């Protein structure tokens, strides 16, 4: 059998509402449950599924079907948690609200049933909601017919309380360990705590605490799952801490001290995981509740330590608020009264710490001692202390912080009596008024009993130091307390027996003689033999008792110690070698220590460096591992999110395709039904009952319609043909008979028309006459009102005219004022615009004049620059010409000298003289190429060649005077320099002329190039500036800063 087709949520909701309307709520719940738990529901949109869930949880609450609600809510959470978390919160809040409303209604109903009884507490006496009917209650209901309040509550209220408890537990199970539903989870947990507190459900509170504890433990176990909570997140951890603090408060209110202590441990575990410190207000609550727990468990030592931590926290909060470093929201509000109260409780709780052991047995066994140490270590960690507290440490800390000044006067006096000026004979008389004041305070009354134990302990310890035996009556008289806290002799004897049993006291009671005998047997006290016999509160407190004198037992125990000390002192005085050996050993040890100190220090430093490196390496490794883990987790989460997104997209795509197919199918079916209806109503003779809509399509329907229309057309044509044939003969016969009666009918018609006309005419005349008479009468009645109307109209017209004139004149005045104002504004605006135009014109003229002046200055500068450039160019041309002439003459002299040397070697005649050489025409040679790049506007090689030719054609005297002029010219690095003028001229084979100038200093090639490539804007020293009589030419001036050509143009 195929599965039933999937129904839309809207149809399911409508069906359920119909069933509810006819009183079939269970059937409606079954329909909704089947739809919600169906796998096909996952593809339904959340917006259409939410109303179904709201009705579903409402029916579950009405019918108390918790299991069905749990199944449906689980399924709904899996559907909606990836798309819309808000709808889950709406449904669950509705579920809880309905359950709470049912409990309230059940309470009202129970009150109505038991209206004759007094109003009792809002909770029944059922201890466990999961075990309501016990055999005792069933037997009691059977044998007793009395209708009591408890029985009414058990029958009416308790089932709904159980359902509400199951509701909270179901919601917490659904929301657990889901980061997207975490806020709702914490809110539900707080509501569950309030439920337990309101109805005093201690058993359910224990189960709730265990449930939350398991959820936190499973959070770390399933941290790799999608949407898992992360306890490393500060916000998540803070929410869990808030929940645990509320759990602690409820546990203290319900006086469930074991659960409160476990809540303290949970809070301490969460605080150890937190990366940021907890708020001071939370820690103040933590220490306050911890102090109450220790007080209930009679652990007065850790109770006093908790009060000490609480006071320190209050002091730090007050200092932080005073310095402006914290906010009032994060720090508890502290007043002077609060500080006084806290200081008093710190001092009073420290005084209440027992001086001797409070354990019930001697406890000298190793396993018991180890268990006690482990317990103390746990409690110390809960308090956040480095080492276990002690009575002396707490007193020393209190005195250092000045608590005596802040404490109440009676507490200060109590401290002085017990710890400073303790006197056994007058202790009770001094402390009686203080105990009365303490007992009058409900909060301090709890410390009276431990204070009595401390007083009795001190009393017997000091009596044992002074007396060997005392009368019981004397002891009873010493141990007298105020009336509400009186101690009986039996209680004193019980205290003595417990102290002797634990080894803290060595007392024998003789009831026959009525005497207390303090044990003088030097071997009777086992206190020294059992180091673990004392409790944690008193193991180091024996020395704090005021020592009046040593007992015989103590003298016997210390005999060997005293003998050793005496012998040691005697040896020091009698035997010098003893001292020398000891001194030598001491010196040797000191020398070894000094020798090894430096090495040990270096080793310590090296070890410290190594430890630091290892720590850094471990930290780096841990951070790297955390980063890698976070990266892997992030990648995994991204992959899961992408896969989830892809799945949702695929599902959305499939749902869209299915919706389109369904819509197309629905439209097709509607069109087919519409066409069938049209066919049924428009075309006769078609039976559509036998037609299957599933197999029917548009083409077949069109063919059926056309066939039927064709059939109808043929039948109609046949009927028309038959009827026309019959009508032709009948109509001809009718018309022949009508011709005989037409004149008579015409005359009768004329007569009827005339009668009708006369009747209508008479009626019209009558109505007109009546209307005229009525109008004339109305005129006569209204004519009396015409003068009054005229006078009233005239009066109204005059008033309106006067008012109009007033308004017209006011409007004219306003118009004139506006007109004047407008004229003034226009004139002012025109004057301002004219001033602006004039100012603009002045600025424009000034700008034009300035631009013209700048242009003229620029042109003048440009002309000046061109003139300077032309002058410099002319100077350079002249200088190049002179240098070329000098070079030509030098070359000729070298050639003559070479010719003379060659003639001397060969024995020939001397070559012609210089004058003869000059007379010969100059032979044209190839131009000298200056391979050094030139910058500027220097002469070309053709110009230089022309200058050489002109110099060769000059007369001889000019050539003879050239060397004298040559000395006065500065050396140019850009042109040719003769060998005898260079720094290395002595290496030349030719001897320079005697009348030539002295050799100049060698200038490197790059400096010559830079000198030859200087811009024309640099100034040159004129040739006449160099003195002719100096041996060395004057040094060239320092090169000026180079200026770009565009800036030279601007200047």
From Swiss-Prot:
InterPro entries, per database record: EIF3A, eIF3a_PCI_TPR-like, PCI_dom
A single GO BP: translation reinitiation
Protein name, as recorded: Eukaryotic translation initiation factor 3 subunit A
Domain PCI: 339-523
Keyword Coiled coil listed: yes
Biased composition (Basic and acidic residues): 617-632, 642-664, 794-901, 916-926
PROSITE patterns: PCI (PS50250)
Record keyword Protein biosynthesis present: yes
Function: RNA-binding component of the eukaryotic translation initiation factor 3 (eIF-3) complex, which is involved in protein synthesis of a specialized repertoire of mRNAs and, together with other initiation factors, stimulates binding of mRNA and methionyl-tRNAi to the 40S ribosome. The eIF-3 complex specifically targets and initiates translation of a subset of mRNAs involved in cell proliferation.
Membrane spanning residue stretches: none
Any one Gene Ontology cellular component term annotated for this protein: eukaryotic translation initiation factor 3 complex, eIF3m
Record keywords: Coiled coil, Cytoplasm, Initiation factor, Protein biosynthesis, RNA-binding
Compositional bias annotation for Low complexity: 948-961, 1010-1039
Family as reported in the entry's similarity comment: Belongs to the eIF-3 subunit A family.
One Pfam family this sequence matches: eIF3a_PCI_TPR-like
The organism's taxonomic lineage, starting at the top: Eukaryota, Fungi, Dikarya, Ascomycota, Pezizomycotina
Region (Disordered): 617-664, 794-1051
Quaternary structure (record): Component of the eukaryotic translation initiation factor 3 (eIF-3) complex.
